[in-house]
Amino acid sequence: EIMPSLVGSEMCIRDRTNALELRRQLENEGAIFHGSSDTEVICYLVTRNRLRMGSIETAISKTMDVLEGAYSLVIMSATKLIAVRDPRGYRPLCIGTLPGGGYVFASESCALDAAGATLLRDVEPGEIVVADAKTGELRSIRDHVGRPDSQMCVFEYIYFSRPDSIIEGQSVHEARKQAGRFLAQEHPVEADVVIGVPDSGLDAALGYSEESGIPYGIGFIKNKYIGRTFIQGSQKQRENSVRIKLNAVTSTVKGKRVVLVDDSIVRGTTRLPL
């Protein structure tokens, strides 16, 4: 569903939690939901806990006690902007500073660039960061920080994130290039050209080319009006979308030995048409 979700005076953005169990519990207590988003469940939990405890920071920390799974949240009240990252740190969340003062939160640093902000640091796994409009201060609440099994989802570097983002000090572009270099070391072949599958496979292909010495070429043109195919409803829809999503540059690949680099295989729908 479209974000953000609003319940009372608290607004939450983005989540992935054990929502179904919590939703049923809240419904049994009289909550009425207006959509199917997990975010609405978190909004209700925070609002309920705040009514009981008074402090929104305490309410959020109490809510985190019962949440399971991956989530990165930005919660806005009348005077505070609050960033929350799940204790395992599955999803990224970062803090930026604005030129005229103030703070901004985003799941990727490239969003900070677009807002004219400067990357300050990442929100740590389990951390609650509060930007207070009254004091102008940034406060850290660390009740859930320090979990030993903290680990970011590897797909953030491989696929989800934009290559111009920096996550936990690591350039996504350079991480993908390095993956391509490792691939060239582990699977060297004789070929005439290295090409990547747009868009997230391009950086890895460039790394493969640099490591192997095989020239890099543009092998596909991507139809920018076709979104991610692996999330579409049926196999037929996915196959049709793949056919019109990518078109080969024949001058690059015709009659040549080609190394084709992609970032990953989820369903494998793209593989056969390519």
Q: How would you label these PLM feature ranges?
A:
Residues 9, 16-274:
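PRPP-associated nucleotide enzymes
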Residues 1-8, 13:
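Single conserved hydrophobic/aromatic residue that forms the stacking wall/gate
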